[in-house]
Amino acid sequence: MSFGFKFGIPPEADLVLDVRCLPNPFYVPELKHKTGLDQDVVDFVMSHPEAQELLKRYENFLQYALPLYVKEGKSQLTIAVGCTGGKHRSITFARKIAEYCTQLGYEPGVQHRDVKR
């Protein structure tokens, strides 16, 4: 799930990942009114080395932690990825994390709570 911190952390979140530390496409005029569903926004976010490194670190954490949740009997886990407004960075990362979870053999669903705000 992607979300914007300015609208509150989703109460159903089991894990909250923060991507506000990354460069914000909101401040790029041609990207401001687009979202992480648009490829040029994804390209902008992921063009920064710190975004690639942060994604790798989140993936490493999930590779370790997800089997532990399964072992404890958790059949569903809500991973909430937040940025300021919930339209650019969080959507990009929520999609990337869902792709990674699929590679690990899980069946993630993805929601973008604040994309239309």
Task: Identify the role of each PLM range.
Residues 75-98:
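Catalytic cysteine-centered active loop of the rhodanese-like fold, especially the PTP/DSP P-loop
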Residues 106-117:
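Short beta-strand-centered segment that lines the nucleotide-binding/catalytic pocket of NTP-utilizing
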Residues 67, 73, 87, 109-111:
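Recognition helices and adjacent regulatory flanks at domain boundaries
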Residues 1-77, 102, 116:
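C-terminal accessory "lid"/substrate-recognition subdomains
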Residues 3, 82-84, 113:
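Short loop/turn motifs enriched for small/polar and acidic residues
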Residues 98-108:
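Post-Walker A helix-loop "phosphate-sensing" segment adjacent to the P-loop in P-loop NTPases
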